[in-house]
Design a protein with these regions (language model features):
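Structured functional modules or segments
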Residues: 1-72
C-alpha cells in the first residue's frame, strides 16, 4: 500500500472534485495520506472528470488510476 485516498480535506467538507466537474492542470483532485503525511494530488491536464475510480478512505497503490479525466 502506498497510501490512503481521500476525496476531501476533512470528513465534513465537500469533495475536491465530482463527476462532471471541469478541472485545470494543477488543480487539487484528492489527498493521499502516506506515513502520516497528507499530500495533495493535482490534475496533470485540463479536462472533465468522468469517473472517480477509488473509494474514499481506500488503500491505493503506486500507479493505480484514481480518476478518469477527459482531456479538453
Amino acid at each position: 500500500m502506498v497510501g490512503t485516498f481521500y476525496r476531501s480535506s476533512s470528513p465534513t467538507t465537500a469533495p475536491f472534485v465530482d463527476i462532471g466537474d471541469q478541472v485545470a492542470a494543477g488543480q487539487t483532485l484528492c489527498i493521499l495520506e502516506a506515513m502520516k503525511l497528507m499530500n495533495e494530488l493535482g490534475s496533470d491536464v485540463d479536462g472533465v472528470v468522468r469517473q472517480v475510480l477509488a473509494e474514499n478512505g481506500a488503500a491505493v497503490e503506486y500507479g493505480q488510476p484514481l480518476f478518469a479525466i477527459e482531456q479538453a
